[in-house]
Amino acid sequence: MSVEVMRSVIDAAEGRVPVDTLFTNAQIVDVYGQRVAPGSVAVKDGVIVGVLYDGRDDAAGTYEAAEVIDCQGRYIAPGFIDGHLHIESSNIRPAEYARMAATRGTTTAIADSHEIANVAGLDGLRFMIEDGRRAPISIKYMMPSCVPALPDEQAGAVITAADMQAFFAEYPGDVFGLGEMMNLPGVFMADPETCARIDAANQTPSKQVDGHAPLVAGKDLNAYAAAGIIADHESTIPEEALDKLSRGMYAVSYTHLTLPTTASQCRSRWSPYH
């Protein structure tokens, strides 16, 4: 945000200048306070500059606005961020996925397209990125870390650490970091190419390296975290997630932890009756 824009939004927040749009009579979803409360939301130059809750902020008055929208009790919530997904698993293009996701409140998605990369290599990633630029939401990508997933696999492409460095430079605003590191033996054995791929991500502004470490514990988990892998979405029990959190990692997904009843009633995905 430039100084000029900052001064403009501050003036609007203080009520010294009119806001562009004022949403009134809304139910505001406060995700930090974990509550829903009635109030209004003011927007200036595409920035939310003011939230006024009914009752608590009555003394502050309201905002003068070029446009007032009566929400009639509808909800206003922050845009949802899907922090990890594989769009190509759905067999639809990024723009089409985004069209449907937007109707459910998702405004940002972080995609790891290692499936198409294992088939079509960097050209597959370019297709996903270029198509995603037409989307009504923001789609960012993680560089697939394991193409192929393991050294002995016969994938449709090979993406080396040098390839990754060049691709990060080619798409600096689209590729955030390194996608889930599935080559666990490569990390545990300090394989030079595996370490070089992690280091390539460390040269990006975000330095984001995602993990994929089901049931990894003890010294192996220490090595995984020491390599700079900061997040994992494969914990299946609370103790496993806590084990990773205690080593400074982020537990990205709690789906397995919050749906135990549903999961216990489902047949195994490997069941012959599935």
Which ranges hold each PLM region?
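Active-site neighborhood of phospho(di)ester-bond hydrolases with catalytic His/Asp-centered motifs
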Residues: 81-83, 112, 142, 179, ...
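Active-site core of metal-dependent hydrolases
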Residues: 177-257
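N-terminal metal-binding scaffold of metallo-dependent hydrolase/deaminase domains
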Residues: 1-63
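Divalent-metal coordination cores built from histidine and acidic residues
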Residues: 2-13, 95-206, 249
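Conserved small/polar residues in nucleotide/adenosyl-binding loops
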Residues: 255-261, 274
